[in-house]
């Protein structure tokens, strides 16, 4: 294969710079590294004087005041080897132009459609005739399946027009049967949420096994099914 791939085979390290002209944040990923891990990631902010490293991205990516606003859920994500909190925003409304619209920014649209099917089939929420818009705040593209729980929580919150308590953070992958599957590096995810002052953390029940909770000040809410997460969030 001629072209850039030839150069990629010659060099020791390949870095990929991701970003968009409409957003201030840029992500630097390691695609190839012969002398270290490729699970490294750097987040930078574009300013007037150039790029500056973001030392604590969680604080910048979260809204300062979303209390009382429906359609917002906070997820604890892992990108590379660093945990950070992201704000998941959803808007659900009745379809007025015939075919319902599905749109996702910063999240895989096919995975969102799968999660909508799980909500309808397993939990009983009728969203087939609703427009659903999803956005990961800050212009980031997140591939971590652990934000599934926050995605469906934001969608349900918007559909019911009921806000999620602002001190709740969550992490969990959703399976096709509606089960909440365990996620990796749960200690780091919980620690990041606790550091930023969150009081409650919803997590897969399986992740409690072997987890040292004696020093944690944050309340852990283990769940096995989407229905249990729904009750924990909305009563």
Language model region names:
Residues 1-235:
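Peripheral, non-AAA+ core regions of ATP-driven protein-machinery
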């Amino acid at each position: 294969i001629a072209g850039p791939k030839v150069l990629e085979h010659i060099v020791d390290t390949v870095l990929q710079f991701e970003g968009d002209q409409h957003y201030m944040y840029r992500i630097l990923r390691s695609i190839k590294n012969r002398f270290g891990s490729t699970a490294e990631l750097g987040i930078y902010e574009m300013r007037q004087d150039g790029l500056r490293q973001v030392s604590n991205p969680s604080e910048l990516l979260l809204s300062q005041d979303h209390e009382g606003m429906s359609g917002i859920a906070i997820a604890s994500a892992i990108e590379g080897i660093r945990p950070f909190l992201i704000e998941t925003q959803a808007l659900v409304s009745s379809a007025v132009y015939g075919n319902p619209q599905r749109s996702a920014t910063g999240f895989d649209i096919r995975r969102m459609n799968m999660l909508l099917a799980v909500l309808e089939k397993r939990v009983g929420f009728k969203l087939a005739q609703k427009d659903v818009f999803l956005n990961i705040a800050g212009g980031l593209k997140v591939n971590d399946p652990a934000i599934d729980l926050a995605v469906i929580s934001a969608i349900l919150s918007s559909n019911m027009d009921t806000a999620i308590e602002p001190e709740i953070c969550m992490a969990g992958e959703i399976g096709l049967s509606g089960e909440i599957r365990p996620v990796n590096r749960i200690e780091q995810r919980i620690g990041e949420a606790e550091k930023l002052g969150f009081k409650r953390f919803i997590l897969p029940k399986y992740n409690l096994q072997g987890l040292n909770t004696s020093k944690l000040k944050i309340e852990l809410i283990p769940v096995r099914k989407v229905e249990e997460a729904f009750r924990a969030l909305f009563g």
